[in-house]
Regions:
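A short glycine-rich, Lys/Arg-flanked "PGG" loop and its adjoining helix->strand segment in the class I
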Residues: 118-132
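A short SAM/SAH-binding and catalytic strip from SAM-dependent methyltransferases
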Residues: 104-117
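Conserved alpha-helix/loop element of class I SAM-dependent methyltransferases that forms part
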Residues: 15-33
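A short acidic, Gly/Pro-enriched loop at the edge of an enzyme's catalytic core
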Residues: 93-104
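Short alpha-helix
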Residues: 159-174
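Class I SAM-dependent methyltransferase SAM/SAH-binding core
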Residues: 38, 46-94
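Short, glycine-/aromatic-enriched active-site segment of Class I SAM-dependent methyltransferases
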Residues: 138-157
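Conserved Class I S-adenosyl-L-methionine
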Residues: 182-253
Length: 253
């Protein structure tokens, strides 16, 4: 397990994404001043720093792996954001905040850890009355994906939904969908897959006699190769949502 953490340590990101994508999604939100922002599953915080550059509010960045938080804290200090970026080691399904604390919740590539619908339901109480949540979620882009890709994701993320399916979950969880944005395929590679693949090559040479680790490395390589072949079949979609009424409350006097 320590070697697997080492495999990922020092990568720019812990999942697909880019500053350009983060800024693009921010441009799709209603133009308002966000004063209290929560970044859930922040990892080493590349998107956290992008949010800090683009927004004037205070940010709480949450992850349950302290080394990632240490990297973020160091980088935030280097950019003079230490007064606005706070790190917190906590679980995303037990966030220690009062109701209505945040006017913007952001989470890139992390909500899958607890499930899209469950995350939306649990985080909703943390938002102000008209607060906004933005998440990127792995999403089927084809109604009939090739069998190889279907088998892989059934094994690794069986809860993956289509855009239509996630849109229904958004409404059922008490949100108004404001916008969606498909992460460009190039944003999977520059800061994530490309450096990860180089690390996989190095680890394969160094630890090739460790059968268990080699199996993990091969699984990571399989994921990268799969996306090269099927990037038009699935991808990360950003969902920007505003807190609204729960379905059962609509129409209530």
């Amino acid at each position: 397990m320590k070697l697997l953490w080492k495999l990922h340590s020092g990568l720019p990101r812990e999942g697909p994404g880019s500053d350009e994508a983060t800024k693009r999604v921010l441009s799709l939100l209603p133009q308002r001043r966000f004063t209290r922002i929560l970044d859930v599953g922040c990892g080493p915080g590349m998107q956290t720093l992008c949010l800090a550059r683009c927004l004037a509010g205070n940010i709480v960045a949450v992850d349950n792996h302290q080394p990632y938080l240490d990297v973020l804290a160091s980088n935030a200090k280097a950019e003079h954001f230490e007064s606005r970026v706070e790190t917190l080691n906590a679980s995303m399904d037990a966030l220690p905040f009062d109701d209505g604390t945040f006017d913007l919740i952001w989470s890139e590539g992390a909500i899958y850890c607890m499930g899209f619908e469950q995350g939306l339901n649990l985080w909703r109480r943390l938002l102000t009355a008209n607060g906004i949540v933005v998440v990127s979620e792995l999403t089927w882009l084809s109604s009939n994906p090739p069998e190889e890709s279907r088998r892989f994701w059934k094994r690794n993320y069986p809860a993956m939904e289509s855009l239509e399916g996630n849109t229904k979950l958004v409404a059922g969880s008490g949100y108004e969908l404001l916008a969606t944005y498909l992460l460009p395929s190039k944003a999977w590679f520059r800061d994530y897959y490309d450096p990860l693949e180089r690390r996989i090559d190095l680890f394969s040479e160094k630890y090739g006699r460790d059968a268990a680790l080699l199996a993990e490395l091969n699984a990571a390589r399989e994921e990268i190769d799969l996306f090269r072949r099927y990037h038009n079949v699935y991808g990360y979609v950003f969902y920007a949502m505003q807190r609204g009424l729960l379905p059962e409350a609509k129409g209530t006097p």
